[in-house]
Amino acid sequence: MTDSSRVSIATSTIVCVEAEIKGEVIIKEGCVVHPHVVFDATNGPIYVGENNIFEEFAVIRNNSEGQPMIIGDSNIFQVHSKCSAKYVGSRNVIGVHAHLEDGCSVSDDCSIGPKCRVFSKQNLEPSVAVYGPSNSHRITSTPNLTPTLQLEFLRKILPSYHHLYNKKKVTAAQ
């Protein structure tokens, strides 16, 4: 982990020391960051909401010069997913090897399938599923659930097997 003076992690958030955090990154309450996740905020800040899960080898990179990347609450970024979106809403599932390209925007309750892409500058409406080799879109009829049980399990088990990053409390002003 580098540049910890610009990293703020809430006290109830679990971050494994094998994660790499560069630049100004604020991670709010209840998130879980697995080993080998990369947060790269060298071009602009990354603000992460509550109760998100970032699985192994996920890469969250803000490529917009000086503009913040905002990630809402209760999202799951699965193994090897990549996100350079300017905005990700809440309750989204970003599948294994999925890619949110530079400057795209994902609203709430979206599901991005394995190996699917949301292309640069594309804006997804709420409850859109992206699936298949041609990145087809459709509207889903049910919203995504918050990953409450998965978060509880990970908060309990990860500290038993990994060293955790020391945190600084996020204040109300942030």
Curated annotation (Swiss-Prot):
TM stretches of this protein: none
Keyword Cytoplasm listed: yes
InterPro entries tied to this protein: DCTN6, Trimer_LpxA-like_sf
GO biological-process terms attached to the record: mitotic spindle organization
GO cellular component: cytoplasm; dynactin complex
Subcellular localization(s) per the UniProt record: Cytoplasm, Cytoskeleton
S-adenosyl-L-methionine recorded as keyword: no
Domain of life of the organism encoding this protein: Eukaryota
Signal sequence extent: none
Single annotated GO MF: dynein complex binding
Predominant place of localization: cytoplasm
Entry keywords, A to Z: Cytoplasm, Cytoskeleton
Quaternary structure annotation from Swiss-Prot or TrEMBL: Subunit of dynactin, a multiprotein complex part of a tripartite complex with dynein and a adapter, such as BICDL1, BICD2 or HOOK3. The dynactin complex is built around ACTR1A/ACTB filament and consists of an actin-related filament composed of a shoulder domain, a pointed end and a barbed end.
PANTHER family reported for this sequence: DYNACTIN 6, DYNACTIN SUBUNIT 6
Family statement drawn from the similarity comment of this UniProt entry: Belongs to the dynactin subunits 5/6 family. Dynactin subunit 6 subfamily.
Function: Part of the dynactin complex that activates the molecular motor dynein for ultra-processive transport along microtubules.
The protein's name in its UniProt record: Dynactin subunit 6
Lineage: Eukaryota, Metazoa, Ecdysozoa, Nematoda, Chromadorea
